[in-house]
C-alpha cells in the first residue's frame, strides 16, 4: 500500500489537480483560438525547431501547473519533473525523491499548431517510478481522463462522468489502429500494411490516442520508438 506524504489527502489532491487542469485547458484553448485566427502562427512559437516546437502555451501551462502545485502543497516531500524544464536545462535535473510529479504541459504540439484539436496535457504523480495518479486533459473535447491507480474514468468541466468503453476484439484484422500523424516511421508503416488493420486513424498526442481507445473509437496503439 502506498502512503501519500503527511498532510496530503488523495481526494483533495485529485480535486486540486482537476481544478488546475481546467485552468490549463483555458490557457490552451485561448492560444488554439489565437492560432486559428492568426495568419502568422510563428507569433506564438518560442523556438524555430520544426521537429520539436515549443509555444507560449506550453510555457504558460508549465509555469501555472508548477506554481499551483508548489504553492498548494508547500513543504511536501516530492519533486516536479517537467518536459519543458528538461529542455531548458537538461544537465541540471536531479531526482532523488520517492514521489515525483511528471508534467508534459502540451503533448501534440504540432497538431496544436496545425489546429487539429489532437493535443493534451499529461500529468502524473509517480511513486518510485510507477504511476500512482494520472491525468490526461484533452481541451478540444472537454475531457479529463483520470486514474487513481485503481479506477479509470473521464469527466468534463461540469463533472459529468463517463466510464471507459473498451472494445474486445481478438483478431488484428478486425481492429482499428490509432497511430501518429506526424511521427510515423517506415518500420511502423510496413507493419500496418502487413497486418492489414480494418482501419487506420491518425492523430497527434499519445494521450489523445489512448483516450480514443478508452472511448471505443479505436482498438490498438503501437509505439516502436
Can you say where each PLM-predicted feature lies in the sequence?
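An extended, acidic
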Residues: 166-225
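N-terminal subdomain of lithium-sensitive/metallo-dependent phosphomonoesterases centered on the IMPase/IPPase/PAP
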Residues: 1-106, 190-194
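Residue-level detector of flexible, active-site-proximal loop/helix-junction positions
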Residues: 87, 151, 159, 184, ...
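Residue-level signal for inorganic ion chemistry
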Residues: 24, 28, 58, 69, ...
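DPxDG-like acidic metal-binding loop motif
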Residues: 94-157
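Short glycine-/acidic-enriched loop or helix-start segments at secondary-structure transitions
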Residues: 91-92, 112-113, 188-189, 212
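Active-site glycine-rich loop that binds ribose-phosphate moieties when present
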Residues: 123, 162-163
